[in-house]
């Protein structure tokens, strides 16, 4: 089925939560907003009635965005090695002017040889760079490279943002996530990119976990690609994480959620220094007043 960018994260989360791990979201590099969700199910265990019930269970995920769930269709395919079939649907994904998200098993295409390569294992349910909020953060990092910076990544998911920060000149990254699978995914992707553990430290937890990893220091840059209500709840802890002259990139929010979040951040002593958007998703760059 077609997969609008607004629904990607919710659909992937729901399928994973249901234990349906044989899925992929694909798009052509030149059209990142035109995605397809593919799901493989063993036919004997999933007759048509069961498949229709599954699609119906996904419909509520589209309601908060005022969108209908795109119509899905099923095709019969020959039984094959799932790992090979799954890998066919991942392609090199250029981001911004000079970044390339590359599935770990692929070689760098000659036409992208000058880009900074970030190798990822898309096997987890966490961001590989294709979601609009992740792309917004990656593009913002590229526009203002964190050269010489200590970076903190709150809600690190796959670790793609921290890996990009290191590639763009950060001296070190500390990362945390409340999901143990995300912590594992970040560690795995760190190894794929040949980054030593002391340059990208990752821990289970939230603000307190980052404070522990920072060891009394404060970060020059905070990355936080989480949903707006979670950002709002965590915002009182940002002061303890970010140096007085530092900044934070906040994404994961819808554009229409930005005004409320800006007010909350303003009350906490932050000002918005830049804004970005891609479709209905937004990004805020903030600094201390």
UniProtKB/Swiss-Prot annotation:
The keyword Cytoplasm applies. GO terms for biological process: methylation. S-adenosyl-L-methionine binds at residues 134, 155, 177, 225. Transmembrane segments: none annotated. It holds the Pfam family PrmA. Keywords: Cytoplasm, Methyltransferase, S-adenosyl-L-methionine, Transferase. The keyword Methyltransferase applies. It catalyses: L-lysyl-[protein] + 3 S-adenosyl-L-methionine = N(6),N(6),N(6)-trimethyl-L-lysyl-[protein] + 3 S-adenosyl-L-homocysteine + 3 H(+). One of its GO terms (cellular component) is cytoplasm. It is found in: Cytoplasm. GO terms for molecular function: protein-lysine N-methyltransferase activity. Its EC number is 2.1.1.-. Gene3D superfamilies: Vaccinia Virus protein VP39. SUPFAM superfamilies: S-adenosyl-L-methionine-dependent methyltransferases. Signal peptide: none annotated. Belongs to the methyltransferase superfamily. PrmA family. Methylates ribosomal protein L11. This is Ribosomal protein L11 methyltransferase. It comes from Parasynechococcus marenigrum (strain WH8102). The lineage of its organism: Bacteria, Bacillati, Cyanobacteriota, Cyanophyceae, Synechococcales. The gene is prmA.
